UniProtKB/Swiss-Prot annotation:
This is NADH dehydrogenase [ubiquinone] iron-sulfur protein 3, mitochondrial. Belongs to the complex I 30 kDa subunit family. The keyword NAD applies. It catalyses: a ubiquinone + NADH + 5 H(+)(in) = a ubiquinol + NAD(+) + 4 H(+)(out). It comes from Pan troglodytes (Chimpanzee). GO terms for cellular component: mitochondrial inner membrane; mitochondrial membrane; respiratory chain complex I. Core subunit of the mitochondrial membrane respiratory chain NADH dehydrogenase (Complex I) which catalyzes electron transfer from NADH through the respiratory chain, using ubiquinone as an electron acceptor. Essential for the catalytic activity and assembly of complex I. The lineage of its organism: Eukaryota, Metazoa, Chordata, Craniata, Vertebrata. Keywords: Electron transport, Membrane, Mitochondrion, Mitochondrion inner membrane, NAD, Oxidoreductase, Respiratory chain, Transit peptide, Translocase, Transport, Ubiquinone. It is a peripheral membrane protein. Core subunit of respiratory chain NADH dehydrogenase (Complex I) which is composed of 45 different subunits. Interacts with NDUFAF3. Interacts with RAB5IF. Found in subcomplexes containing subunits NDUFS2, MT-ND1 and NDUFA13.
Amino acid sequence: MAAAAVARLWWRGILGASALTRGTGRPSVLLLPVRRESAGADTRPTVRPRNDVAHKQLSAFGEYVAEILPKYVQQVQVSCFNELEVCIHPDGVIPVLTFLRDHTNAQFKSLVDLTAVDVPTRQNRFEIVYNLLSLRFNSRIRVKTYTDELTPIESAVSVFKAANWYEREIWDMFGVFFANHPDLRRILTDYGFEGHPFRKDFPLSGYVELRYDDEVKRVVAEPVELAQEFRKFDLNSPWEAFPVYRQPPESLKLEAGDKNLMPN
């Protein structure tokens, strides 16, 4: 009797498996249930919400850095998206970056980006921005410093090897000189290029024009020639992204020699 019961169970198992293969049987209880959710429209914003806990931790760490390096740290702030920014004196580039890289509570060992911002209305028009990443604590920090056209900034290659090409790009595009750089030369523009294209006062047309001369069978460089006479364009726009960096427009003044040009 026991052997017959086992045989019947074995035969029912085969029939059940074949029925499932044909799609005519019921699913087995061992199958995991599929979770289905409604595909309703999500109207929530896609921005990252504010995290008060992370905001407090970043603020505390920023204050800690300011206490350790009071000679160099000038300002510490946390943005609304939990991004820590440390503004330092130009002389503190190497000490601050070394501290953030080697300290046990920091471990910012990756330089993910190094760039510059040109604000001509400031006395120190160039803002140098270092973006660091800590894989140990899954955290980021932004270090900012400043300089002008003539004052050099200490190169960060001795702290982060990745700063080599970043600093070459800043020198090429903005003209910021990095002292003690192992190979500070242009990296994007051609040899003999004049000026620095990312400066706000760099003309859109450039200073020279490169074209192929069919007579000499090579590329020649010539000064830019405008096809029309110079006009003064209105640089103030209602869609200006950074209006606070613009100087207020000067009111037009009527000189004595221009009175005859006014319509009667």
